[in-house]
């Protein structure tokens, strides 16, 4: 694929593999009984809508239906007028999620084409974490109810959980959980980790997650899956976790580098509920963080308490203890990614009430995030600057391609058609 060195947002949108996606839509019967809102039209309309606003809604998506400028941009035939938000809601409920998952997979391959082998080696750290989004408007049909005290008189607000495996450039696996049982990270994170391990075409990946995963059984499943593909994981345990130590793993105890003090580095096993050692052998690294960290203030004015000591668990027996501690530090990158999605790509605004629709919106959000990261990399810009410039370029393109609403014809504006500049 011929990718410009410094592409505009319009050039990136024209790189979308529309022919291949149309073939997949036909083969997967995505457009069964759909005359107007086909999968391709929904894909293109939602892509532009995500780039245009930070507060996405079904009505906003429907308002772009009659924008014939977008019809020319994507080579689609669109009719004039609006599409009702109820029609969009119905399509979000019924369209197969696999079409949008496949679309994200194909579009993320564009990013792989501009990634060098050295950069790919740096992307072998896969951060896995979850982020909660609250349903403020009461749209969700199903959701988790968390954090509300009984007897306050306030109705329970439902929440949903986004869980993703992010390698720094693309999301290897993602899912949305609405069942209350998935409030525990012991269920959500292992499920996404195993999906990422099974779907990734790469080897030697290192999966990073926090201490929400503590189940001996789940850690064992992750250990077996990662070893099978020559991958590994680095997690975190509670400091009070009982460990059956079988031997010393390293010689770096007592070393301090970049504010990290290695206290102990041992081989051992976790104990099961019955008190017996588990069959899986791990490496346990206890570290102390010497750098003073200023905790962020919470709403109630209390300081958040950080542990000075951290207990890491891993099945990586070759890297040094300091290297593994450095890997775990990079887990924070996914928190920055979640923040970007919430602030710039409407992650916190729920535009569908069904789980099917929420998953479609999730993959659409990731598609646009991939385009933003490609634009950001090729134009040497930060994420906020990149998405700001992409929005301006898209609006400028629409302005330079006005539409004769009376006849429904495209009228491409030239420089001579623009109003003269004022001398004042």
Annotated model-derived regions:
Residues 56-77:
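DNA-recognition alpha helix
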Residues 71, 97-99, 282-287:
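Short helix C-cap/helix-to-loop transition motifs enriched in small/turn-promoting residues
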Residues 87-167:
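Active-site-proximal, Lys/Arg-enriched surface segment
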């Amino acid at each position: 694929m011929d990718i410009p060195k410094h592409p505009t947002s319009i050039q990136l949108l024209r790189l979308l593999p529309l022919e291949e996606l149309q073939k997949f839509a036909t083969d997967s019967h995505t457009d069964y009984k759909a005359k107007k809102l086909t999968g391709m039209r929904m894909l293109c309309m939602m892509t532009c809508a995500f780039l245009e606003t930070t507060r996405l809604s079904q009505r906003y998506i429907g308002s772009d239906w009659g924008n014939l400028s977008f019809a020319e941009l994507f080579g689609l035939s669109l009719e004039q007028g609006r599409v009702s938000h109820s029609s969009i809601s119905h399509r979000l409920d019924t369209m197969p999620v696999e079409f949008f998952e496949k679309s994200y997979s194909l579009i993320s391959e564009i990013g792989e084409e501009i990634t060098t082998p050295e950069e790919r080696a740096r992307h072998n750290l896969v951060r896995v974490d979850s982020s909660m989004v609250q349903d403020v408007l009461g749209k969700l049909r199903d959701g988790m109810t968390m954090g509300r005290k009984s007897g306050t008189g306030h109705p329970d607000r439902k929440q949903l959980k986004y869980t993703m495996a992010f390698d720094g450039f693309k999301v290897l696996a993602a899912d949305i959980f609405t069942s209350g049982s998935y409030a525990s990270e012991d269920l959500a994170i292992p499920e996404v980790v195993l999906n990422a391990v099974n779907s990734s075409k790469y080897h030697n990946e290192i999966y990073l997650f926090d201490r929400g995963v503590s189940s001996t059984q789940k850690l064992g499943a992750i250990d077996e899956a990662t070893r099978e593909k020559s991958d590994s994981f680095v997690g975190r345990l509670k400091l009070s976790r009982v460990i059956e130590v079988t031997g010393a793993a390293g010689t770096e105890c007592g070393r301090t580098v970049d504010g990290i003090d290695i206290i102990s580095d041992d081989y051992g096993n976790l104990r099961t509920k019955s008190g017996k050692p588990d069959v899986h052998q791990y490496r346990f690294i206890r570290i102390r963080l010497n750098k003073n960290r200023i905790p962020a203030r919470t709403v109630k004015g209390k300081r958040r308490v950080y542990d000075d000591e951290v207990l890491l668990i891993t099945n990586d027996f070759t890297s040094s203890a300091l290297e593994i501690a450095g890997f775990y530090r990079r887990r924070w990158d996914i928190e920055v990614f979640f923040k970007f999605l919430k602030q710039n790509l409407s992650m916190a605004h729920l535009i569908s009430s069904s789980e099917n629709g929420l998953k479609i919106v999730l993959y659409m959000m990731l598609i646009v995030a991939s385009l933003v990261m490609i634009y950001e990399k090729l134009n040497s810009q930060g994420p906020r600057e990149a998405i700001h410039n992409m929005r301006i370029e898209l609006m400028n393109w629409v302005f330079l391609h006005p539409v004769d609403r009376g006849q429904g014809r495209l009228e491409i504006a030239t420089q001579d058609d623009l109003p003269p500049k004022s001398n004042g």
